[in-house]
UniProtKB/Swiss-Prot annotation:
Binds 1 zinc ion per subunit. Zn(2+) binds at H611, H615, C714, H718. The lineage of its organism: Archaea, Methanobacteriati, Methanobacteriota, Stenosarchaea group, Methanomicrobia. GO terms for molecular function: alanine-tRNA ligase activity; aminoacyl-tRNA deacylase activity; ATP binding; tRNA binding; zinc ion binding. This is Alanine--tRNA ligase. Its cofactor is Zn(2+). Pfam families: DHHA1, tRNA-synt_2c, tRNA_SAD. Catalyzes the attachment of alanine to tRNA(Ala) in a two-step reaction: alanine is first activated by ATP to form Ala-AMP and then transferred to the acceptor end of tRNA(Ala). Also edits incorrectly charged Ser-tRNA(Ala) and Gly-tRNA(Ala) via its editing domain. It is found in: Cytoplasm. It comes from the Archaea. It comes from Methanosarcina acetivorans (strain ATCC 35395 / DSM 2834 / JCM 12185 / C2A). GO terms for cellular component: cytoplasm.
Length: 925
């Protein structure tokens, strides 16, 4: 459908011909009239290995600088990289391409680009090919996309397809690439709600660049179909190019794999740690590795591609058995994958992602645990942090990673410990699951393996090993980890908000929010634009509408002598709706009335104090705990606030003290709170993406709030200076989910009240113990020690009592077919006490014990000695039947079982039933 898009003067004027690949069927452009294939792997093997494409070798830094300088010299502005965690997006977690830096606001035309045209080298992370990493020789989870972008509008074109191709060809020519070796393959592109024609730039089997011409947007009514979606033309159109930095370096060196080209030192180090040096020094192995590398383009593990079949293709081409090739290649491929994954982790953790079970943290843990699993397979015992440190030493252009290394190291050590615990626990979980499927004669299904990984972190390889010992089969696709990564790489799509009374509001103008301009003003006049039910819409307001974790203002709206309480304020697409309480059932305000509004001062100031304090506590936590701290959520109340922080371990009491101290110092410095509206792009360039701690607000301009050293995009109400907040008191902290710590605190009068409450508790506790408050810790420690001693003594006495009861019970036991039967109600005994007696009696091989108690309903315990079990008596069956009589249930093992019920009036009936069952068993025996 896009064929005409590729009929360009660039191709016609430079000797290109359009052909169709005889292998994949795709169309491509080439200067070589004899060429019949598109040049891409697997249609063509890697022919640059051992025969570099460029006139000289480049390392990563040199290639990056060459590219950026090339485009700077041709009118492009160089931009610094964005983080690999997409803080400015709420639809994706990771930066997957350079264009993601400018979505959605720039690409949609809402916001102007930071420069036009521009060039950037953007580190990216993609996990959709996770299982191909290490195997194909070319796949990476973490890569840098060198790019140049031009943002065009109808009537204001910077440049489009012709010049983009000219620049690409000129770049390759400057690197002395053989022009007859270059193919431009037609491949429509779609992603992120946009699409357009695209050409892939391929040299000697290797795709070096992708040139996307984004001019389409998703449209259900659109007439352009691409990859199953319908699109229509955009008003703006964008040059979106991506040049693979690592692939350019690889092409310049002609190394066997991209990993050898990028990380030769780390690959050699890991080969040594894995005990694979002999393979590298063996001529036969070296030849096999080289031949495999040329054909590794086949090894693209996907949903449709089976690993064994791919391996067979390569083995057949080399002329050896697939088993021998697998034995040689699998350990080497794991070394390559570990090398790649650890660089990916360097960027993830270095840019502030905390491993967890949700969002970007889930993806970091996915990569991390896959790495640890492969290291375990190769018996590499070096700490993960040491390998990450090697990468950091190789990347001096990222000094922020060196600065963050102590935190990165701490995170990795913590995660390794968690992984080992998971493996221990996971073995038991798999055994239980496998036992279930053994009974049904089934294999463990993929859905169960996915659940085991998602909920417990148990890798499918481990499930396969453990289940095999039980005789249960496990099968999972070769691209299992890619599937998992794909499931979690995007934020859940938000349900479209159902706007109440949308029809009524859509014709109204946006409400002027005057509380931003005059934050201390609480009384105002406004014109009523609409009234319905108990809702009022005004032309302007000083009432803050609920948002950003801050509750709405309350107060009054009056007309003449009639006063209504404002109980809620909400905003719907810019229109603010005031909800009032109508005691008499009728609202006596009409459209066009001029009302007087009064905001409740106490509530406004209390919430403003807590909101401003939230900024201060967040900043203090970042200074104490590290730059990785990120606000995962916040909610303000009148009596306290809570702040959820991404952090990899519990915040210690000492750290909390430091955070509280720093926060109060900021208050006492009485710094002015500065608010200003700034163009989004300018704000991002000045302050970075820490702006979006509280979420990503829409619009070309965003409101910036500076509180001390904290700078955020924020729409809430704040104090005019930090001194107005008053004291800040941290009340408690808890771990609400893996990787997230919740800090609760109070500010101002609420903090004073919280401290008074704590003081009252101390005073009351001191009175109870008859000591001064300052002696409370010593006294509590002494009393606790005495309590523990008394508890031990109590336990000892209980054991003595149990033993004495045992002797008495044995004396009172009845004889039955060579067995002794104890059947007794023990008044006031709890389950533990009954269990101790039964366990003691269990030492007698020929004793059957039936015990009951009426404590808190009915407690039942039965024990059966070894000889009694041989007679067919089962404690579990006894308790089950006895429990039915007292209105309950129970069970257990043949030797010991527990149960109970709710009807103590039938205890004797239950004991009698137990005795009957023993007699029946003895008769049958």
């Amino acid at each position: 459908m896009l064929e005409d898009e590729y009929q360009l003067d660039f191709f016609k004027n430079n000797g290109f011909v359009r052909k169709q690949c005889q292998k994949c069927g795709k169309f491509f452009w080439t200067r070589d009239p004899e060429r019949n294939t598109c040049g891409d792997a697997p249609c063509d093997p890697y022919s640059f290995i051992g025969s570099p494409v460029f006139s000289r070798e480049f390392n990563i830094s040199e290639m990056r600088e060459y590219y950026l300088s090339f485009f700077e010299a041709r009118g492009h502005t160089r931009l610094d990289r964005y983080p690999v965690v997409a803080r400015w997006r709420d639809d994706i977690y990771l930066t997957i391409a350079s264009i993601a830096d400018f979505q959605p606001f720039v690409t949609s035309g809402q916001v102007p680009p930071p420069a036009n045209p521009l060039t950037i080298s953007q580190p990216c992370i993609r996990l959709n090919d996770l299982d191909s990493v290490g195997r194909s020789g070319r796949h990476l989870t973490n890569f840098e996309m060198m790019a140049h972008h031009a943002f065009n509008k109808r009537g204001n074109e910077i440049y489009w397809k012709e010049h983009t191709l000219e620049l690409c060809d000129e770049l390759l020519t400057s690197l002395k690439v053989d022009p007859f070796a270059v193919t431009y393959k037609e491949e429509p592109w779609a992603g992120g709600g946009n699409a357009g024609p695209c050409v892939e730039v391929i040299v000697h089997g290797l795709e070096l660049a992708t040139l996307v011409f984004m001019d389409l947007k998703t449209d259900k009514k659109g007439d352009i179909l691409i990859k199953g979606e319908t699109y229509s033309k955009m008003d703006n159109y964008i040059v979106d190019t991506g040049y693979g930095l690592e692939r350019f370096v690889w092409a310049s060196k002609g190394s066997p794999t991209i990993y050898d080209a990028l990380f030769p030192g780390i690959v050699n180090e890991l080969m040594g740690l894995a005990g694979l040096e002999h393979e590298l020094n063996n001529t036969e192995y070296s030849n096999i590795l080289a031949q495999n590398a040329r054909l590794a383009g086949f090894m693209d593990v996907s949903e449709k591609a089976n690993l064994l079949e791919l391996r067979k293709k390569v083995a057949s081409s080399i002329g050896m058995t697939v088993d021998k090739l697998s034995v040689i290649m699998e350990p080497v491929e794991k070394v390559y994958a570990i090398t790649d994954h650890t660089r990916c982790l360097t960027f993830m953790l270095g840019d502030g992602i905390i491993p967890s079970n949700v969002k970007a943290g889930y993806l970091a843990r996915l990569v991390l645990r896959r790495t640890l699993r492969m290291m375990k397979d190769l018996d590499i015992r070096t700490p993960l942090s040491e390998i990450v440190d090697m990468h950091i030493r190789n990347m001096p252009e990222y000094p922020e990673f060196r600065a963050n290394f102590p935190v990165i190291q701490d995170i990795l050590e913590s995660e390794e410990e968690k992984f080992n615990i998971t493996m221990e626990r996971g073995r038991r979980i798999i055994q239980k699951s496998a036992s279930h499927f053994k009974k049904t004669g089934e294999k463990i299904p993929l859905s169960q393996l996915t659940e085991l990984y998602d909920s417990h972190g148990i890798p499918p390889e481990m499930a396969k090993e453990v289940a095999a010992d039980i005789g249960v089969g496990v099968e999972f696709p070769d691209n299992f980890y890619s599937i998992i990564g794909e499931l979690h790489n995007k934020a859940e799509e938000k349900e479209e908000e159902v706007i109440p009374f949308a029809e009524r509001l859509k014709h109204l103008p946006k409400t002027k929010r005057r509380f931003y301009d005059e934050p201390t003003r609480l009384e105002f006049e406004a014109v009523v634009l609409d009234v319905f039910d108990n809702h009022i819409v005004l032309d302007n307001t000083f009432f803050y509408a609920e948002g950003g974790g801050q509750p709405a203002d309350i107060g009054t709206i009056s007309v003449g002598d009639i006063v209504y309480k404002v109980v809620d304020v909400q905003v719907y697409e810019g229109v603010i709706v005031h909800t009032v309480d109508i005691p008499d059932g009728e609202l006596e305000i009409t459209k066009g009335d001029i009302i007087t509004g009064k905001v409740d001062e106490r509530r406004r100031m209390t919430l403003a104090r807590h909101h401003t304090a939230t900024h201060i506590v967040n900043d203090a936590a970042r200074k104490v705990l590290g730059k990785h701290i990120w606000q995962a959520g916040a909610q303000k109340f009148e009596d306290h606030s809570r702040l959820d922080l991404s952090h990899y371990k519990h915040i210690s009491p000492e750290e909390l003290k430091q955070i509280e101290l720093l926060a109060n110092r900021t208050v006492m410095e009485n710094k002015r709170v500065i608010t200003e509206w700034m163009p989004r792009i300018e704000a991002e360039q000045v302050y970075g993406f820490g702006l979006y701690q509280g979420g990503v607000p829409p619009g070309e301009k965003i409101r910036i709030v500076k509180v001390g050293d904290d700078v955020e995009a924020c729409g809430g109400t704040h104090c005019l200076s930090t001194g107005v907040i008053g004291p800040i008191k941290i009340l408690k902290t808890e771990r609400i989910q893996d990787g997230v710590e919740r800090v609760e605190f109070a500010a101002g009068i609420a903090a004073v009240r919280a401290m008074q409450k704590m003081e009252s508790l101390l005073v009351d506790s001191a009175k109870t113990l008859s000591v001064p408050p300052e002696h409370l810790p010593v006294s509590v420690e002494r009393f606790f020690g005495e309590w523990k001693d008394l508890k031990k003594e109590n336990e000892r006495l209980k054991e003595d009592l149990a033993r004495s009861r045992v002797y008495r019970m044995l004396g009172d036991a009845s004889e039955l077919a060579g067995l002794r039967v104890v059947s007794e109600q023990v008044p006031g005994a709890d389950s533990l006490e009954l269990q101790k007696i039964a366990t003691e009696l269990l030492k007698q091989e020929n004793v059957v014990t039936l015990l009951a108690s009426d404590l808190e309903g009915v407690k039942l315990v039965a024990s059966v000695g070894e000889k009694a079990i041989e007679c067919g008596i089962n404690a579990g069956n006894l308790v089950r039947e006895m429990s039915k009589i007292v209105g309950g249930g129970g069970g257990g093992k043949p030797a010991l079982a527990m149960g109970g019920g709710t009807d103590p009036t039938r205890i004797q009936d239950a004991l009698s039933r137990g005795l009957e069952l023993v007699k029946e068993a003895c008769k049958e025996a």
